[in-house]
Amino acid sequence: EDFHFYERFERGSAGLAGAYGEPVFEVWLHDWSVSQVDEGIYHLQSRQGEDWLDLELSDIQGRVLQGQAGYSPKGPDVGNASYYISQPRLETNGSLMYAGEQFAVSGWAWMDHEFSTSALAGGQVGWDWFALHLSDGSELMVYTLRRQDGSLDPYSSGTYITPDGVEFSLNSGDFEIEVDDTWRSPHSDGVYPASWTLNVPAVDLELIIKPHVANQELTLSFIYWEGAVHVNGTRDGSDLAGHGYVELTGYAHSMQNQF
């Protein structure tokens, strides 16, 4: 299995890149684009060389306002916060062209939109973020903010969404994450977590999370790890599985003062 990643920058002029919110949502950068087809339905297209991706995504659950009605504090100061909106359950169908072969693809996607004035507070060096689709129809998003002394910041938080769509906000004391294994990057020499046990005692949720591919490090403008994971565990004593995405920053270098 291979992991591929790309990065582009462009000025928002001459039609090269841009975004609209009305009358419908659209954002594009050259031939990478996401456009709204109808209420809750989006068309995603991207091309890199001879490879391309063409997907239709349908929001079957609706938006989730993370944190305090969409306001997500990341530290004690007023500026250390973000506005954070998710669409965690997007039914996805489409086509993928890779190495000259076309594939039909389907599954579930998760869209996050987060924007802020500052990513980290003083003393914070990075974050670990998890977004998981579970086989019982529930979803889990949690993130931990790591401090220079190795401790977890109390502003770490998350959201658990039941199979019937009820949302539960999680504070830092509501979940536990233990690193079970690590992986050292041959490119950056950063040492990343590579397996986790994640527990949410309030909903009797116990999960084991492992990457699909060990090397999902992105060596771009910022060096960090972000990639696909698979999940096994239990809720209320019943077995479940799942898939998701994990983002790990601050392991190759501190993210402090990077934004």
Regions inferred by a protein language model and the residue ranges of each:
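Targeting-peptide/extracellular-domain and disordered-appendage signature
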Residues: E1-F259
